A protein has these predicted regions:
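N-terminal phosphate-binding or glycine-rich loops at protein starts, especially the Walker A/P-loop
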Residues: 4-51
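Short internal beta-strands
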Residues: 52-61, 141
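Glycine-rich, charge-decorated loop segments at or immediately adjacent to ligand/cofactor-binding or catalytic sites
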Residues: 65-69, 139-161
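Glycine-rich oxoanion-binding loops at beta->alpha junctions
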Residues: 69-103, 115
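Glycine/threonine-rich flexible loop motifs
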Residues: 112-124
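Conserved anion/nucleotide-ligand pocket segment
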Residues: 161-234
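Glycine-rich, aromatic-lined ligand/substrate-binding cores of catalytic
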Residues: 203-205, 209-280
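Conserved functional hotspot residues or short segments at active or partner-binding sites
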Residues: 252, 257-360
Length: 379
């Protein structure tokens, strides 16, 4: 490995925070907002001469990244700096005028993982809208897309946008947060927003996170490592079904099952499908949190054998098809499959194992690849 990638915060720091001098700053961040030497962006801005850090904002999972998914996060105070912390995953998901009072600029420094329904990008988009309405600036400190910027996968939304589907993106979008911010500004009509992206040094699109030399900080409690992040855009899509996706195990999103599933039969069917870059092993497990706590579950363990060939949405579609055929009522398939998938045509065809679902998405993927070109920073 060569010289590590310098993330946006490191580039800003090397320039003595010039972009923020004489500015009153509101910082949207969490535990992943750290420089290469492990110093938190909060502390760097708070200690920087000429930068006035006024207020902190946190996303889902809170400032320290310890709150479980879907649990409201309360406002609070940062014990180290004494600054007010405004939760953007509590009573408000979009900053209010009162939250932005007295600020000149908002700064966003959070590690995303590259999936449409991972909520940090929804938080960024709503904060950009609020900043535009308030007439203040917005700065994104860019970070790598952990699962690579060279691949996109999945359909564009076929239904209404929401907090878990915040923009017209495929499920695996292959963009950094800085690139997405550029797209959001252009496509949401935020022309009045003074947006600046502090780009990374040394980043290339084909990089996986462990190619960058940037230290890994688990972006949320159930994405402990890169392997979980790689399969998340697929297995995460099954989250609202009545199955365990491995929360409360040592391998979240790499284990899935339920008490009523025959893990051996599911593993055999999935291996027979010869999906690229992946193996399935039958497993029995007992989740310690989320669904089926303390219950014996049967299902599969997912092992990535070639991440460059692995297609997370293909994996999820094969599993969802089995569930639709064998356990439709038990998994609440008709009621829940569309929540994160947001593509009725795919939901309708999942149960037919003879259908190549990738064909449904090919036009969406190609049109998105063309559309995103104008917003890409890195080759």
């Amino acid at each position: 490995m060569g010289t590590p990638v310098a993330c946006g915060i490191d580039v800003l720091r090397a320039d003595s925070f010039a972009l923020l001098k004489a500015k009153r700053v509101g910082l949207i961040t969490n535990h992943t907002g750290v420089a290469a030497d492990g110093v938190a962006t909060i502390d760097l801005l708070h200690q920087s001469e000429g930068v006035e850090l006024v207020r902190l904002f946190c996303p889902e999972h809170g400032l320290r990244g310890t709150a479980e998914n879907g649990i409201k996060v309360e406002d609070g105070k940062d014990p180290k700096t004494g600054l007010r912390v405004v939760s953007l995953y509590g009573e408000s998901r979009k900053p209010t005028a009162e939250h932005l009072d007295g600020l000149d600029v908002m700064v966003f420094d959070i590690q995303d993982i590259g999936a449409r329904f991972y909520t940090y990008i929804a938080t960024m988009g709503l904060a950009m809208e609020a900043a535009a309405e308030a007439g203040i600036g917005f700065v994104v400190l860019d970070r790598p897309n952990p699962i690579g910027g060279h691949r996109v996968e999945g359909p564009l939304p076929g239904g209404e946008l929401s907090f878990v589907c915040p923009h017209d993106l495929p499920i695996r979008h292959g963009m950094t947060v800085g690139e997405l911010a550029q797209m959001f500004r252009a496509e949401r009509g935020l022309d009045q927003l003074d947006l600046k992206v502090v780009k990374m040094d040394g980043y290339r699109r084909e990089m996986w996170f462990d190619d960058t030399g940037v230290p890994w900080h688990a972006p949320s409690p159930n994405i402990p490592d890169l392997d979980s992040a790689i399969v998340y855009p697929g297995i995460g899509m099954l989250e609202f079904l009545n199955v365990s996706v491995g929360r409360g195990t040592k391998a979240p999103f790499r284990i899935m099952g339920a008490p009523f599933i025959d893990g051996a039969a599911l593993a055999a069917e999935l291996m027979a499908a010869e999906l690229k870059g992946i193996e399935f092993l039958a497993i029995d497990f007992v989740p310690s949190k989320s669904k089926f706590v303390g219950e014996q579950c049967s299902g599969v363990r997912i092992r990535v054998t070639n991440r460059d060939r692995c297609q997370p949405l293909e994996i999820a579609s094969a599993i969802a098809g089995h569930l639709a055929r064998e356990h439709r009522e038990a998994v609440l398939f008709d009621e829940k499959i569309g929540v994160l998938l947001n593509h009725p045509k795919t939901a309708e065809r999942l149960q037919d194992r003879t259908v190549a679902l990738n064909d449904l998405w090919e036009a969406d993927e190609e049109s998105f690849l063309r559309r995103r070109k104008a917003f890409l920073f890195y080759r």
